[in-house]
Amino acid sequence: MNITATVLLAFGMSMDAFAASIGKGATLHKPKFSEALRTGLIFGAVETLTPLIGWGLGMLASKFVLEWNHWVAFILLVFLGIRMIIEGVRGGNDEDDEPLRRHSFWLLVTTAIATSLDAMAVGVGLAFLQVNIIATALAIGCATLIMSTLGIMVGRFIGPLLGKRAEILGGAVLIGIGAQILWTHFHG
């Protein structure tokens, strides 16, 4: 996977956390930068670990399905992309809209895990490709840190305008990456 695809994947994977952060930021009157950064660090750390876990699980199975790797990655990315788009259109669940006010560490970790399950599934798909998983996971974590921090800070301004549309954009990016993987397989 080239650097452009890695960056697109990283920011695509950060969209769930970004959408959750916008919702949480929209509930704050004047979020402090320290609150936003704390949220970004927690979301980013979890989002770095989950693709590594998924990649490890995928590596266990890779010897059995190596000849199908492009299809596995394509199907996972398209499935996740469609799911994100559907959630964006439907509006997701009400948990994402609960106030951030002085959230405990564990509540933030739980929210981060909930928004990073897609990254774990993507990690499974990445196990079937020749990628530097450490660099990819770090890119996903950094993008999530940036987008979550930004989401908290600007959430109250753009929450009503963008909200779950961030998930739609993230889903479209995942579908595009899946299509690129399949295209590259068939057209070299």
From Swiss-Prot:
GO terms for cellular component: plasma membrane. The keyword Nucleotidyltransferase does not apply. The chain crosses the membrane at residues 3-23, 41-61, 66-86, 107-129, 143-163, 168-188. It is a multi-pass membrane protein. GO terms for molecular function: manganese ion transmembrane transporter activity. InterPro entries: Mntp/YtaF, Put_MntP. Keywords: Cell inner membrane, Cell membrane, Ion transport, Manganese, Membrane, Transmembrane, Transmembrane helix, Transport. The keyword Cell inner membrane applies. Its main location: membrane. It holds the Pfam family Mntp. It is found in: Cell inner membrane. HAMAP family: MntP_pump. Belongs to the MntP (TC 9.B.29) family. Probably functions as a manganese efflux pump. NCBIfam families: PRK11469.1. PANTHER family: MANGANESE EFFLUX PUMP MNTP-RELATED. This is Putative manganese efflux pump MntP. It comes from Citrobacter koseri (strain ATCC BAA-895 / CDC 4225-83 / SGSC4696).
